[in-house]
Amino acid sequence: MSYRSKQASISRFFKSTKSNNSAKNEPAVQHIPKKTGVMLKFSYNNKENVVEGGKDTEGPHIVGSHVELPGQSVNSVVNSDSIVVNSNLEIDPKISSVLKRKPDIDIQLKTTKKRSKTLTPLEKQIRELRESHKDKVLVIQIGYKYKMFGDDAKLGSKILDIMYIRGGDDGTRDEFSYCSFPDFKLHINLKRLLTHGLKIGVVKQLESAIVKTVEKSSKSSDLMKREITGVYTRGTYMGDEYVQSSGNSADTESPYYIICINEINQKELSMVAVQPKTGDIVQDTFKDGLNRDELETRLMYLNPSEVIVLSSEQPSVETLKTIRLVASDVQLLPRKRKGEDEVFNGLIEFFDSIDNGKYKHLGDYFSVNFSKHIQSCFYELINYLSEFKLSNVFTIPDNISNFTNSRKYMVLPNNTLYALEIFQNYTNPASQKGTLIWLLNHTRTRFGNRLLNKWVSKPLIEKEKIEERLLAIEDLTGDFNNVVDALKIQLDKMGKSLDLEELLMKTHYAATYNLDKINRRDIYNMLDCFQSVLESMNRFEKGITEFSKTKKSPLLTNILLELSEMSKTTVVSNLLNKINRSYVMNESKDPEEQVTQFFNLDNHNWEDIRSEFSELDKIEKLFEEELLNIRRVLKRPQLQYITNNKEPYLIEVRNGKQVDELPTDFHRINGTTTVSRFRSERTAQLYIKKQYHKEKLLVNCNVAFNDFLKEIDEQYEFFSKIVKNLSVFDCLLSLTAASLASKNTRPILVDQQLIEVQKGRNPIIESLHNRNDYVPNDIDICYDNKVLIITGPNMGGKSSYVKQVALLVIMSQIGCYIPCDRATLGVFDSIFIRMGASDNILKGNSTFMNEMLECSNIIHGISNKSLVILDEIGRGTGTSDGIALAYSILRYLIESPLRPLVLFITHYPSLHVLEDSFPTVVTNYHMGFQQIHKDDNDFPEIIFLYNLVKGVINNSYGLNVAKLAGLPVSVISGAHRVSESLKYKVEIQQKEQFTMKFGSILQMLKKDEINSNNILELENLFSYI
């Protein structure tokens, strides 16, 4: 009995009494879900396992509802003791005797008998594949399943929570232990594996059994050809490339960057980052200190999944520590830097080789426009991405941008991002609620969402560009406009499910490397979406012209005019005319039919596809002729072919006499207790021939589809321009929505460095809490009032106030209205914030060291257009040293010729003397409060007013915070007594010091011994008084 016959015999013994099949008492052979409780229990290597149905063709695997091992009879696995069947299933009586008789090969699964060490052809193939790709976890297609072997299987079974089946016990079989899953779950499981930082290689069967049989390219017993068709990491995975789309082409995860860092020396680094999903490329060269704050800022922005570090010998410890600190789960790849000649020649050779020299000119472009250090990064990334077939991302130079551009935008440092919680809520990292991006993000599309993140992270510093966005918001908040509304509708139709930017990049990769990187329905949806946008703009051509004349915003007008101009072309319509829309849109069609019926053959001549359709039509006619012949032979003029269990062209006859009278060349395919189904010899031959031509048709359709992708990719620049305009429009709509969310006001921008705000509100706190309860505050920082020293009780609102100032500045320079009654603002080129207390164990820094390093970076980074916010400088060390450092740092900023605007929060009231020394620059403020004295309390209770008041206070009222925190009354009372005692001692010491100072100066005055030193002491005494 053949392998296939044995498989059919065992499968047929399952028969469901609840079957809905038309034939009475017909056994149901099907994959049974877990919930039905149908299981097959077996023991393998002293381990009991329960498995479910599936179907494979080679290797140790599960077939139907049984387990099959290579070299064993199917009957040896199935016996009456190893079947556990649900009550709604019964065993076919016809084969019950097969289950009871002794197996053909008597093998017990619990045996300790050693197998032969001779490897099967499949095992040899698996070993060769794994030996050739030791750096990857391999997922190998075998029949209708994907399997992982050896150590890969141990890892996979644990991550995927699937059964791990051990190999034999001959000492060499552990490498063939495996776990498996159905082929349709490939991309579901790939995503789960990739989240653990693995590098996955997908090995696919590249041959069809029917094509091999018909063309006789090899013996039928030969193995299927298997090769790696895709390699993936978390940053290079592009989504469900091989799976027919369900209408949601977008992944919910944010795309990752892959970064190459080139350590030029200890203080200078170059960097190139690429985001394969979107094609975004960022490059930068920057100076950095040993603390690597600049590198940390870039890593926080880019969120890398893989980081390549180039160096002459070994990467510096400082760089490696910083990478691990910011991205603990990143894949770190140290590399030795290549020589300049190798890099130059490598870039030239790469661009020459892509797409038959189409991008040859880019070799010179990269060598001329980028430094040697940046070129090294490009070359290393090209080599790295080549394995993933993504290196052609560098053939689109328009996607390359600078990380920093001091003339266009500011880059918020990592401390500022952290302190203001721009992108991440550090109280609840799982949610963005409470962040600035959460407040501003009302985008409709995924590509708009990505652009808004860039806008928020890099506020503009060109007044004219900020005004352009503010004018656009003003126009969008005006009267209803048909053109604007039509474009809004187009964005809403795309939503977050259709990512045009990602689909364009998938098309680019697939067109260059002939890969299944994108499915047909997504291509149609993408083109249809572009067409819908352009048709909409074409309909409102007159309205767009009128809009451009009546509205103020050049930014909004340019978007509409450019889209209107593009709508006059036939680029998209010509491509869409080649698609058979009815088949693409009908989701009920078979996936195979979606491939073969994708093109509209009436509008384009695909000769190879036409010829295969012609052959299939001929075969269908031959089937009909054979049916007429069978009718005559069987004397059944109404006889029709039937399809059963996906087996077509079957002749069904009743068991008994009708079966006995069939010609000898009729082959039984399947049956029940009452009927049997056959194919005639001629029908069987035609069926094989039809399968062959269907396979050839699929191949030809895939070739034609790849040519079609190349046509689309030729228009990449055209489509990319549409996406960029739509993304800017989406961001403007988002900022408009944020501006209208509360009583926001358009800021007035001026050339002077000042912040004058009437009744300003912290936008985050206001959004999270009841707006009616919020206490607004004025802000007045200008040339004559550049430094604000802010004191006040703990929890009085000092930090919220200074954060409010920074957030209002950032919002205004993003181009958004801000929450206040009126605002006049200068344009800042940097915002530095030192706030909070934390150590950094990974970098080996204490809390105070971190504080001082951050202060050092601020002092060295300020300009005359900087906003500096310092919170409680000096608290990480002793009081005297803390006060001294806080005083010196603040005085340095005051006296600096750059003279930035400074907000300085402190609990050191003695710093108020700086207002006396610099009355035209420094002003003391405190957060308002009220004291309530009660008879039963040793100390007053505090009511916070949360308003900014001029003046200084000498008490932080920490005991009130302790009370709010729930410390025992006895502890707080004890602390109050100690506090009062310390205050008394300090006052006594101060009086004694004053008496001594005053007495000595009085003696000098009596003796008339006044000199410059005495005068200085006298000034100090008066200041002290």
From Swiss-Prot:
Disulfide bonds: none
Source organism per UniProt: Scheffersomyces stipitis (strain ATCC 58785 / CBS 6054 / NBRC 10063 / NRRL Y-11545) (Yeast)
Membrane-spanning segments: none
Gene: MSH3
Protein's cellular compartments: Nucleus
Family indicated by similarity: Belongs to the DNA mismatch repair MutS family. MSH3 subfamily.
Compositionally biased intervals (Polar residues): 1-24
Database matches in Gene3D superfamilies: 1.10.1420.10, DNA repair protein MutS, domain I, MutS, connector domain, P-loop containing nucleotide triphosphate hydrolases
UniProt keyword annotations, A-Z: ATP-binding, DNA damage, DNA repair, DNA-binding, Nucleotide-binding, Nucleus
One term under GO cellular component: nucleus
Matches recorded under SUPFAM superfamilies: DNA repair protein MutS, domain I, DNA repair protein MutS, domain III, P-loop containing nucleoside triphosphate hydrolases
Principal place of residence: nucleus
UniProt region (Mispair-binding domain), positions on chain: 114-235
Protein name: DNA mismatch repair protein MSH3
Function: Component of the post-replicative DNA mismatch repair system (MMR). Heterodimerizes with MSH2 to form MutS beta, which binds to DNA mismatches thereby initiating DNA repair. MSH3 provides substrate-binding and substrate specificity to the complex. When bound, the MutS beta heterodimer bends the DNA helix and shields approximately 20 base pairs. Acts mainly to repair insertion-deletion loops (IDLs) from 2 to 13 nucleotides in size, but can also repair base-base and single insertion-deletion mismatches that occur during replication.
